[in-house]
Amino acid sequence: MKIFHNLSELPDFKNTVITIGSFDGVHTGHQSILKRVKALAEAVKLPSVVITFHPHPRLVLEGNNAPVQLLTLTDEKTYLLEKQGMDYVVVAPFTKAFSEQSPDDYIEQFLVKYFKPKYIVIGYDHHFGAKRVGNIDYLKNNQTKFGFEVIEIEKQFIDDIAVSSTQVRKALEKGDVATAAKLSGHYYSFSGTVVKGQQIGRGIGFPTANIAVTDPHKLVPPHGIYAVFVWHKGTRHKGMMYRGDRP
């Protein structure tokens, strides 16, 4: 998989199978879209392209102090997208000017200009353009003009819960990591830097690693004790995590 963070570095795409979205958390709803993209791209022998954005649109539109809690930071998101077998991931810069494009300019000057899609696989609730007035019907109305086909992926349900990033966040904010994992299709994860503590645990026979999560917008589960897997230098270890001020 190839990852691009700058539109000027993109290859000269001719025909592609694309999908577009924030993909925060890369949950089972997102995965249903990505599976369709991958299967279709393989069937028609065209490259699969996932287009996502950085920073998160709300941080641009509402400011960096917006109460945004992300399930995945950009590197975490691209890692999960890679596991879905995509050929290309494009992390497009999201700016105020980009958000103010008309839906027509978004289609012609962004999607068609850079990706020349043959197929656009998209979720039922996708919106785009200034004030989010563009939607899936708007894309469908432009199929003939630009020669692409729009494929809509319907809302996904698990245990009568409509899968969404919002529902995953709600579960995590309550400490319900089991429901979050079921909706996500994977365990919730975060990464950070090990920082030196008072080494009290080591003194009583339970050495610990203090992890600093420095991005203020990364969602961290509430205070509590959690069973975890820890990846360190390519090896997975079982562990216990305490989240709180002092164990």
Question: Residue spans of the language-model regions?
Answer:
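Short acidic-hydrophobic, aromatic-tinged amphipathic segments that line or gate anion-handling sites
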Residues: K2-S8, V90
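Glycine-rich, highly charged phosphate/nucleotide-binding loops
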Residues: V68-K77, Q101-I107
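Classical nucleotidyltransferase
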Residues: E100-P207
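Phosphate/ribose-recognition catalytic cores of enzymes acting on nucleotide-derived substrates
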Residues: G197-P247
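A short acidic, helix-capping loop that chelates divalent metal ions and anchors anionic groups
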Residues: P57-E62, A97, A162-V163
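N-terminal catalytic cores of NTP/NDP-binding nucleotidyl/phosphoryl-transfer enzymes
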Residues: E9-L73
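Residue-level signal for inorganic ion chemistry
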Residues: H27, L81, I120, A180, ...
